[in-house]
Amino acid sequence: MAGFMKNAMSYLGMSDVVDDEDDYIEEDEEQKPASKSAFDSDHTVTPLASTTAPAASSTTKPFPGGRVNRITTIHPKSYEDAQLVGRALRDGVPVVLNLTGVAEAVAYRIVDFSAGVVFGVRGSLERVTPRVFLLSPAQVNIKVEEPTKPASAHDLFAD
């Protein structure tokens, strides 16, 4: 126990540094020199043939490019429906995610999953309303305009 206290006090800077290495002095034993034949050999090393990366598998599809010709609207009923979001974004289709019919805890899980998918495809996620989101893949650019608030109720319908 005294050794522990010495080490603790030394660690906290309350005493001199304990040098435990001096406690265990071993007698120098005669060491046999290693045989030269163990390290030097006449065997030659044959280099391996360089390998190239395997070609892309036939199941891999290139990421779709070009114009977007459809948008998918998803109204999930449970967390299991979140995979529909992942499939659509993987295929390059923008998704409108409407969470109005889902419990709040499930909606948070779906948004979390969807945000991960959007990150994975390098896309973007925009909140349209508190429970409706627009998720778009990388090749789709979304222009977000901040709505201007009317000065008064009379200006609400003014052109």
UniProtKB/Swiss-Prot annotation:
The keyword Acyltransferase does not apply. Residues 23-69 are annotated as: Disordered. InterPro entries: Cell_div_SepF, Cell_div_SepF/SepF-rel, SepF-like_sf. Pfam families: SepF (PF04472). GO terms for biological process: division septum assembly; FtsZ-dependent cytokinesis. Its main location: cytoplasm. One of its GO terms (cellular component) is cytoplasm. It is found in: Cytoplasm. Residues 44-64 have a biased composition (Low complexity). Keywords: Cell cycle, Cell division, Cytoplasm, Septation. Cell division protein that is part of the divisome complex and is recruited early to the Z-ring. Probably stimulates Z-ring formation, perhaps through the cross-linking of FtsZ protofilaments. Its function overlaps with FtsA. Belongs to the SepF family. Homodimer. Interacts with FtsZ. This is Cell division protein SepF.
